[in-house]
Amino acid sequence: MKRITNERYQETYYTETLENGLRVVLWYKPGYARSLFMMATPLGAMDLMQEDAQGNTYSYPAGIAHFLEHKMFEKQDQDVMNEFSRMGANVNAFTSYNETAYYFSTSGSIEGPLDLLLDFVQQLDISDASVEKEKGIIVSELNMYQQMSDSRLLMETYQSLFHEHPLKYDIGGDENSVRSTTRQQLEACYQRNYHPGTMMLVGVSGKDPEQIMEQIRRNQRSKQFAPLCPIHRRPIREAASVVRERHAFSMDITVPKLAVACKLAPCVDALERLRREWCIRLAQDLCFSSLNPQYQRWLDEGIISDFVGADVDLGADHGVLLFYTETQKTAAFEALVDDVCKQMAALTVDEEALQSLKHRYFGSAVRSLGSFDDIAIGYIRSAFAGYDYFAGMDIIDAIRAEDILEVCRSLDLTHRSVVVITPKR
């Protein structure tokens, strides 16, 4: 077991890769009664086409990672959630576009819940009947999101941008993909993506790391696993063009909502991707928030409302720049976004405002070291992406005004989609 201490942030954690390949990270928080353990696989909603070392490809229906997450809690001989509750632990799980994670937290003994977490995640117990039953539950969940205007706006925006990329699908897939999913597909996907050599376990606790690690070793030694067959997401060949330059539809709302989104070039290097994201995000804040002297006028004139925001998402095979609001003045908002993008590319950075923003984000990152959930998911995401967790935090502090200008000037914003939700008449 290797001990690692980051002097700048005064944080200590221990790492070990077990014989079966499971990567274990124990973040030591002395003096805390609470413990949190998260077990994750880099199987997310974007993993619809995978490839092994021999070049064999495997395709899955959209939403299969989310479907598996639902089924993992189902065991024929026990109720996993009730078992965690009986031991005084809260258990949950989530699927994102890049990973699936299962976790519990407790202020009591961790021995029982930790063994249960390892055991239930490392065993899939499904039947044809249980899979068919789950389909109705998931479809109902997807239909619920379809009725939520905010979720629908984002989903329709991605569908307007992407021809082939899995971002055009909801994390849960769609009704057709869910209905077509079979038990055999779920089992094959599980076998390829839930091997210990693919997964990671992160624990954040004030309890003795050596005792915890020994329990994990003991649990894993008692199990047999097939040899690991490394698998990875197959790269997506996505056209630079968008699917729909304009798209409008109606929902049961009172004020129109719209999104203006640009399809950006991807960035393969993980740390460079993070740096570019932060540069763009800081530029968005400087130009499209209350830091801009014009912001109050936009509000007063009704061009934007309290429902307003901007975001950026860069991946190894995708990129999105997004602005959205709720307004009657949809044309004026489109023109405003054009102006903001021009400002970002010719930005004269106010150094005081930039330092204030950096301090806010960096302070938030440092405060997240007090959140067990943030530590676990942050470490897992950085590890799966291939960069050091603390290096990701250091990037914010290192960004300069010229970095922001250089990145924003390099953006190609010609591939754009506008999506509008209008009130039903």
Identify the role of each PLM range.
Residues M1-D79, E187-R297, S417-R425:
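His/Glu-rich zincin catalytic helix
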Residues D79-I231, D269, R275, C279, ...:
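Charge-rich, well-structured scaffold segments of protease-associated domains
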